């Protein structure tokens, strides 16, 4: 596993040097900046740089990065949200971490304390670390990104249907979606309070739908120092533009953690 993690870190560093040379030059030469973008439900033939006109999808910005940098033709990836993120962040096969199926609110499996974490490795090497978007590695306080090496997290914890309740109009008239994704109660997380009307209390931070976007911070990437605040519900309407909010949060983090100002590289 350690060899795999080391190889993973090397690949990320190589990828950053190839694709983000300008940004990397701002950080100390031996520690390049790392900006990794993960997309859900995207296959190789959804990206123009790979399908080369055989499919209808157009991805000009991604294609430009590929044309100016490097493309990888051989790779390993898990084919679900939770399993893919587990493999990426830990370097472990998801089965070993007990994180194979997509996580639902209140799930008893989650990313356990002490699990190897790429973010923690990089934080220990002097990186400023942040994650933005969907996490999907469990909703326990111990599973949040800011308990596993990230100093900041802004985003949401499940797939969109679980965030909003059931999104189909003919079903959405139900007051809750308990039969699909049971509401549950907070575990003690500084800044978040148990919502009214929850049922089946569990050791988790999920809410009755629509569930909230949260903003968490931890100066040293540990659960002990993490605190979170509610950034408002991720409704069906908000989900149409939440990517713009995520982009704004990433840009703000990069501005605040500019290596020219902090003398530290970043991992986002």
Question: Each PLM stretch: what is its role?
Answer:
Residues 1-4:
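Positively charged n-region of N-terminal signal peptides that target proteins for export
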Residues 23-268:
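Formylglycine-dependent sulfatase
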Residues 6-19:
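Bacterial N-terminal signal peptides
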């Amino acid at each position: 596993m350690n060899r795999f993690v080391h190889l993973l870190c090397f690949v990320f560093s190589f990828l950053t040097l190839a694709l983000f040379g300008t940004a990397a030059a701002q950080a100390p030469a031996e520690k390049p900046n790392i900006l990794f973008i993960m997309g859900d439900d995207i296959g190789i033939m959804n990206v123009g740089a790979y399908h080369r006109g055989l499919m209808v999808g157009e991805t000009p910005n991604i294609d430009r990065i590929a044309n100016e940098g490097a493309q990888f033709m051989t790779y390993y990836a898990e084919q679900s949200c939770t399993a893919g993120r587990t493999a990426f962040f830990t370097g472990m096969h998801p089965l070993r971490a007990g994180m194979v199926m997509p996580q639902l609110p209140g799930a008893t499996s989650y990313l356990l304390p002490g699990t190897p974490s790429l973010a923690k490795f990089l934080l220990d090497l002097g990186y400023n670390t942040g994650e933005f978007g969907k996490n999907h590695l469990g909703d326990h306080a111990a599973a949040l990104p800011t308990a596993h090496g990230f100093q900041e997290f802004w985003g949401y914890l499940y797939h969109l249907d679980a965030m909003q309740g059931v999104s189909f109009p003919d079903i959405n008239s139900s007051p809750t979606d308990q039969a699909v994704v049971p509401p549950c109660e907070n575990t003690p997380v500084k800044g978040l309070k148990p919502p009214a009307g929850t049922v089946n209390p569990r050791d988790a931070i999920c809410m009755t739908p629509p569930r909230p976007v949260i903003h968490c911070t931890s100066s040293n990437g540990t659960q002990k120092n993490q605190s979170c605040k509610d950034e408002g519900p991720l409704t069906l309407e908000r989900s149409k533009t939440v990517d713009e909010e995520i982009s704004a949060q990433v840009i703000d983090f990069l501005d605040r953690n500019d290596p020219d100002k902090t003398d530290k590289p970043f991992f986002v």
